[in-house]
Amino acid sequence: MDRCGAYLDTMRSTAPLVQCITNFVAMNVMANVLLAAGASPAMVHDAEESGEFAAIAQVLTINLGTPSPRWVEGMEAAARGAVAAGRPWVLDPVAVGATAFRRGLGARLLALKPTVIRGNASEILALAGAEARGKGADSADTVAAAEAAAQRLAEGSGAVVAVTGPVDFVTDGRRGIRCGNGHALMPKVTALGCSLTGIVGAFAAGQPAFEATAAGLAFFGLAGEEAARRAAGPGSFQVAFLDALHAMTPDDLDRGAKLEAA
């Protein structure tokens, strides 16, 4: 894929308002990641306003991380509001296969037609109805093992599906692309995966979902590579990562993106 940097340039020039319904652990990290990248986060999750706000925001992201009945109402109201307003929305099916409650919630949200689904291999397998071996929010399956399920899920749902791991896989059911950017320190910082969903959302606001998702993954992973060069461990990595997101230029992304057709 050519010119990933153009997607970064467009995202920053529009500074999209990203409505984030995420978990308690991720809120601060996700907001700072989006701000550093050039987007505008809004952590609006209550059912009293989430649906109305989804029509104001340029994009919605929903994370299943810490669901409760009231938050679930907010998720469903926001998804309905985004669809009604013609806004893209991104589903992050955290630990969707872990419990019956999460499986049911995942199925209901899937029926509300997300634009993009971003999860690890075990989450994508579970959401697609295949056998998965997830450990809570962590994956026990490989990205390669989930590629066929991701294609089926994309075909059946109409969403772009991104399976993230050491090498990411993105598909719209017809096309596939792999992203090799990233660093081993990234999974050592909590909520970076959740924050990646926000970045995918920011890139997908007003841009073609398949290409924007791939560009967002490359941007995020390349920032991880840059941060790792300066970091001594997970603590300093977290700070360096925000700086790398902020400092990256479109030309940097064009030079450093590791994308290839699958």
Swiss-Prot record:
Keyword line: ATP-binding, Kinase, Magnesium, Metal-binding, Nucleotide-binding, Thiamine biosynthesis, Transferase
Biological process, per Gene Ontology:
thiamine biosynthetic process; thiamine diphosphate biosynthetic process
Q: From which organism does this entry originate?
A: Cereibacter sphaeroides (strain ATCC 17025 / ATH 2.4.3)
Residues annotated for substrate binding in this entry: M43, A191
Residues bound to ATP? R118, T164
Q: Name one GO molecular function term.
A: magnesium ion binding
Name this protein carries in UniProt: Hydroxyethylthiazole kinase
Q: What is its EC number?
A: 2.7.1.50
Q: What class of enzyme is it?
A: transferase
Q: Which domain of life is it from?
A: Bacteria
Q: What does this protein do?
A: Catalyzes the phosphorylation of the hydroxyl group of 4-methyl-5-beta-hydroxyethylthiazole (THZ).
* UniProt keyword Cytoplasm present: no
The protein's annotated catalytic reaction(s) are: 5-(2-hydroxyethyl)-4-methylthiazole + ATP = 4-methyl-5-(2-phosphooxyethyl)-thiazole + ADP + H(+)
